[in-house]
Amino acid sequence: WIMGHMVNAIAQIDELVNLGANSIETDVSFDKNANPEYTYHGIPCDCGRTCTKSEKFNVFLQGLQKATTPGDSKYQEKLVLVVFDLKSSSLYDNQASDAGKKLAKSLLQNYWKNGNNGGRAYIVLSIPNLAHYKLITGFKETLKTEGHPELMEKVGYDFSGNDDIDQVAKAYKKAGVTGHVWQSDGITNCLPRGLDRVKQAVANRDSSNGFINKVYYWTVDKRSTTRGALDAGVDGIMTNYPDVIADVLSESAYKSKFRIATYEDNPWETFKN
């Protein structure tokens, strides 16, 4: 999965997919009542990027739905996975459940069209704080209450705080999550970061009793870093330059080992070769 980083305006969906992304990451900011409000990152953000592009969250979802619905004039067949980077650190811990409920309602209405031919992409809820695990339970409960528990088949999870992997496992246990787990590791492109924790996450993924299904590394803009991440065995790379990642994947060392994921590839299944 080549994950286009910081896609917060509808026009950027086409821009990053056309450069080779089959996945995008979108920032979600919340108001003080835990309503998802804008797709917005803000300052500071990655080196070499504009940090302030934004849409109202529900408007962005409507654009995203068009981009991921076969038959729509804006349909992008390659776009199969969306990571919502939930900026829930602005909330009190006791608002996490409400944030999850409100997020589920927004997605249900504006993305899934209440189960009536909505967008088809898989969704990862990426949460920055282990204490906010109730965001997951609130989200799940709401889809059930609203009569669409089947949509949880399209939803996965990530805790993005670079926490100790054992602590991440505990948070999932509290949230009742077994499966659909993506594990991120990384840092802004302005700073270097080693691959030690990525390798730990990959080892967990590949062990018989691990809880992780997929591992992604962020934010990677250089060919050398891309090669390091691929050599470590990641499933996804988040980048500001999807074309750079696509280039490296076409190198002889990688093209026989990796291919770009399509809609037929289940993002919740651990890859076994």
From Swiss-Prot:
Needed co-factor(s): Mg(2+)
Cofactor binding remark: Binds 1 Mg(2+) ion per subunit.
Pfam family, one: GDPD_2
Major place of residence: secreted
Sequence similarity: Belongs to the arthropod phospholipase D family. Class II subfamily.
A GO CC term assigned to this protein in UniProt: extracellular region
Keywords assigned by UniProt, alphabetized: Cytolysis, Dermonecrotic toxin, Disulfide bond, Hemolysis, Lipid degradation, Lipid metabolism, Lyase, Magnesium, Metal-binding, Secreted, Toxin
Enzyme Commission (EC) number: 4.6.1.-
Tissue specificity annotation: Expressed by the venom gland.
Superkingdom of the organism of origin: Eukaryota
Protein name per the record: Dermonecrotic toxin LdSicTox-alphaIB3av
